[in-house]
Amino acid sequence: MTEYNYDLFIIGAGSGGVRTARIAAQHGLSVGIAEQRFLGGTCVNVGCVPKKLFVLASQFPSKYYLSESFGWKYTTEPKFSWQVLKENKDKEIERLNQIYDNLLNESGADIMHSEAKFIDQNCLRVGNKNVTARNIVIASGSKSNQPSFKGNEYVIHSDDFFSMEKLPNKILIVGGGYIAIEFACLLNNLGVNVTIINRSNQILRGFDREMVDKISQSMTQAGIKIHLDNEISEVSKFNDFYNVMTEKGCSFQVDKILSAIGRSPNTENLDLEKIKVETSKNGAVIINKNYQTSVNNVYALGDVVDRFQLTPVAIHEAMSLVNCLIGSPKQVDYENIPTAVFSTPEFATVGLSEESARKRFRNIEIYVSSFKSLSSSMSKKRDEILLKLIVTKNDQIVRGCHMVGENAAEIIQGFAVALKAGATKQIFDNTVGIHPSTAEEFVTMRSITR
């Protein structure tokens, strides 16, 4: 019988890779894990965690001015320091990195801070040595897409954003997905002049259009300029500014350009071709329902398979994969996965959009409610909340739950449990609400909008 250095070796120590390593080690497997960049992956270091911290920082100005209508008066204007935010963010990320390091060490997994490449299906080159394993998991995550226009070397990506030396005065953001929208809103809240350019005719494709229209309207009212159906043709540098030309002849002069045109599976430097692991056109590793690739002892999960680029999904996949390895497979249910866009206003959703529901079901009922939030009720601020339920007519099952407004993510996370359990509209109606709260509106909507 062949002896290996490890029962299981994982390439990539992001959320999915770390969870795989820990759970496998708890089941008695000998585990190694390689990470050449930083523990915690994209989410902890250059993704959701620092993004949310920056979003929170950007919300204080509006709370400051809103407080005046509640009787607060200040003798001096608040001042914002980008450097202080960056330094404190770095400390928090270092703390989280150390937590991941401790968790792996406590589990008994061996951590190797090096790049890993395939030599054969059981052997990897990790740093300057060869490592063998009975099974190997690819959890190498994703990388920012590079735009193809002339002058793309002047562009920064979402990974670079959190290490910018100073806050720009004017920024052009390329893209219309959730990353672009979140950065646009937080920068606008911090006083930056923001313009978005998107090659598509809409932002946030795939989300419920009614909700997206509300976000787009709010962004425009806040001063964010959105250019759709257009793309950059060329960027040139002039002193401390960048001149941007578009395909439709528009021109912009900005001091920073941020590309947020999505992320692709990070598989380029793994030498997958040596073992003939099948990938899609964009480099995503192709897997079966048990996360097994075309090579029987090689598995993959998380962003690298390009199914759902969400940290909680990767964590669930990790637990499911380990169950498969130890002989008790349990599949991840990809229906009704909640998600949020930390825009201004915040947007969160679970289940089907109205557009998707109309394609899937013959008859649906739509419930919509909009109202001014209590927090802005005594001010001149137009902070309107929009809620939406999508119900199939024949069985009255709630198929979609959407919210635009303050604390949307926290509220929708709770209702995601109801949708996962197959709750009907009657169950919603029979639930007593908490008053006064935004969330109670979801259980008091009685009139069908359409």
Feature map (PLM): residue ranges:
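Beta1/beta-strand and adjacent pyrophosphate-binding region of the FAD-binding site
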Residues: 2-14, 167-177
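Glycine-rich flavin
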Residues: 2-6, 22-29, 34-167, 195, ...
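A Rossmann-like FAD-binding core segment of flavoenzymes
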Residues: 113, 117-125, 131, 190-289, ...
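FAD-site-proximal beta/loop scaffold in flavoenzymes
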Residues: 153-168, 251-326
